[in-house]
Each structure stands twice: as structure tokens, then as C-alpha cells.
Amino acid sequence: INYSNQRNFIIRKYNKLCDWQLHLDADEILTQKLIKSINIILASEEKKHVYLIKRSVIFMKKKLFFGGSSNWHLRLFPSKTTLVENTTYDQHFVSSKSKQYLSGDLNDFISSNISKWIISHNNYSSSIAKVKYKNIKKTVNANFFGNNIERLRFFKKMYLKFPSSFLKPIILFIYKYFFLLGFLDGKVGFYYCFFNSLWFRTLIEAKKYENKL
């Protein structure tokens, strides 16, 4: 049973019980501005759209603004309109309904300290290293000119196709830290880009190589 199976089980269960669904992880907190935006949508009783929410990362007790740390995710939707991609890794909520963006942030406190973050990502990297990407059926299209999620999928697809497993994490770090201005988040911005791209992605590539030995 993977993340997709669990989410879709809950979605289908509450399709019969609720008009709307808002999906959060345990380490995510809504800002007051986002709560206000959600209340306006619910009060309108209009169910024509599904809604993307801006996820902002809190890393080492600092809210990050650059380096690709913030992205949009479909989290609020009328029941019976949305499911999660049935994949092992990098799942997204998908819907045929038109999408709109909500004001306010969803703050994601990704770990209480760097040691716990490293432990969890070490375990996570082992799962990712076992995935055979060519066999994964994705529902979200990879589209540079699409919405935020489709654009992220496009860049991830390009990253996975890059031939050098040694250079991929280095290029990703350079892209996030310099081109996506991760350095503007100061010292914590460097640590985030280093651990999230260079360290984490190198660890995945090393485990992929180890699995072939």
C-alpha cells in the first residue's frame, strides 16, 4: 500500500460524507490569509473549480522564498472531482476541473531539526532508488508552458533523462542556488539547496549504482 492508495481510499470514503475536501500533511499549517481565502470559497457554494495552494518551506526555523522551495499544489476541491496519481513516487492530486489559485500560504515545517531531516531523507532515498522510472505511468503531463505542477514535471523529466548520474545533482544545485536565487535566503538557503539537491540527489544516484552491484 503506497501513498496514492492511502490518499485515494480516504478521498473516496469522504466523497460520500463531505461536499469539499482539504488535504494536509501533519507538518503543514495554514496561514490566516489562506484560511480566509478558503472560507470565502466554501461560503460561495460554487463548485466549478479546484484550487491550488502555495506550499512554502520552513527549513531550520526559517521560511524560504527562493531556490525553488515554494510551489503550488492542488489541495482543496469539491468531492468526487479529484484523485491522486497512482504512482510510487512524486504523486500529485489530479482533476479534470478548471484550476484556480488561492491567496495565502501553506507553511510546511519539513523537519524540527537537520538530523531528523537527514534520517527521513536517507530512508526516502532508498525508496526512490528502487523505482524504475520508465515503468511509471504519470497522470500529470510534463509541460513547460503548463501550470506550476506540469512545469515541475517537465523539469523533473529532463533531469531524469540527463545521462550523467555524477553531474545531475551538481547541475541541479547550481540551478536552484544561482538561477532560482537560493542564495537570497542567506545561509539557510545554501543549506537547503545543498542538502535538498546536491546531497539528497547524489545519495539517490549512489544507491541506484549500489543496487546494480
What is the meaning of each model-derived region?
Residues 5-11, 24, 31-211:
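Catalytic-site signature of metal-activated, phosphate-bearing donor transferases
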